UniProtKB/Swiss-Prot annotation:
Its cofactor is Fe cation. Homodimer. Transmembrane segments: none annotated. It comes from Clostridium perfringens (strain ATCC 13124 / DSM 756 / JCM 1290 / NCIMB 6125 / NCTC 8237 / Type A). Binds 1 Fe cation per subunit. The gene is luxS. Involved in the synthesis of autoinducer 2 (AI-2) which is secreted by bacteria and is used to communicate both the cell density and the metabolic potential of the environment. The regulation of gene expression in response to changes in cell density is called quorum sensing. Catalyzes the transformation of S-ribosylhomocysteine (RHC) to homocysteine (HC) and 4,5-dihydroxy-2,3-pentadione (DPD). One of its GO terms (biological process) is quorum sensing. This is S-ribosylhomocysteine lyase. It comes from the Bacteria. Belongs to the LuxS family. Fe cation binds at residues 54, 58, 121.
Length: 151
């Protein structure tokens, strides 16, 4: 199997929450695409709830784009410990952290979930505003770092 960047990360030595630049790709026409690991909870110790994570995905899709112009996608990690963000350009981790703090703060102010209906969402019943707010609050209280390895 081809080496996968995320499998090369020593998950026993990271300290969540953090933002990590997971890689940069340069396309055949010179386009730069950056990938970020937005880790909310500690790998192999905690999980984001299915409903809370799905709801956060909906919120982050909008709020992160309010601060970052070149977002391609924000996707939940299969391990349920955070999200991947892909973006055009070589963006600084500090800018991602600032946008994420803004976005999670905005989640705490919300009273309804965007696009949580069968027309716009493939799993419209798999949402919880309460759990999304709880996850957002926990990440903000713990503080988001750009230092991801435990020393």
């Amino acid at each position: 199997m081809v080496k996968v960047e995320s499998f090369e990360l020593d998950h026993t030595k990271v300290k969540a929450p953090y933002v990590r630049k997971a890689g940069i790709k340069i396309g055949p026409k010179g386009d730069i695409v950056s990938k970020f690991d937005l880790r909310f909870v500690q790998p192999n110790k905690e999980l984001l709830s299915d409903k809370g994570m799905h709801t956060l995905e909906h919120f982050l899709a909008g709020f992160m784009r309010e601060k970052l112009d070149d977002v391609i996608d924000i996707s939940p990690m299969g391990c349920k410990t955070g999200f991947y963000l892909t973006s055009f350009g070589d963006i600084n981790v500090k800018d991602i952290i600032e946008a994420l703090e803004y976005s999670l703060s905005k989640v705490l102010e919300q009273e309804e979930i965007p696009a949580a209906n069968e027309l716009q969402c493939g799993s419209a019943k798999l949402h919880s505003l309460e759990l999304a707010k709880s996850h957002a609050k926990q990440v903000l209280e713990n503080g988001i770092s750009d230092k991801f390895y435990v020393e």
